[in-house]
């Protein structure tokens, strides 16, 4: 990505996101302005998770992974992430570390807690937490993001890396490509 001047204030980045979301919703009404703003909050979070590029062992799954491939797919309420090679607690610690990455965009993601969410007899090869982060732009709380974090049985097909198809047109924000859980494996899990 070419060097661009970042937004100088939290209000500036917030206004740019709102304007881009309105324009995008006018062009494609499958998602409304508020859903697109929330999607940008997801992207700000995921740009931190995938900030290590090809070195990353994180994979995006679920509805957010679908939106990254097909921009007019249904809106989703959470982010599904898979981490290879870590225990669940190690993955949680790594997620918290990555969420604190400063991308110069005035966003901050504050860990708010987690609870056991998957595993046990129903899913013996997978362990997971439902993790909550508070979203801040500057010092103002804006939203809450829930992440379904999973470790365990990994994908059997090739991982793809791509820019999110649902991204808003915000060239002054640092964005990192997502590593996407294979579609065939995602379907098999359902």
Where are these regions (language model features)?
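Compositionally biased terminal segments of proteins
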Residues: 1-190
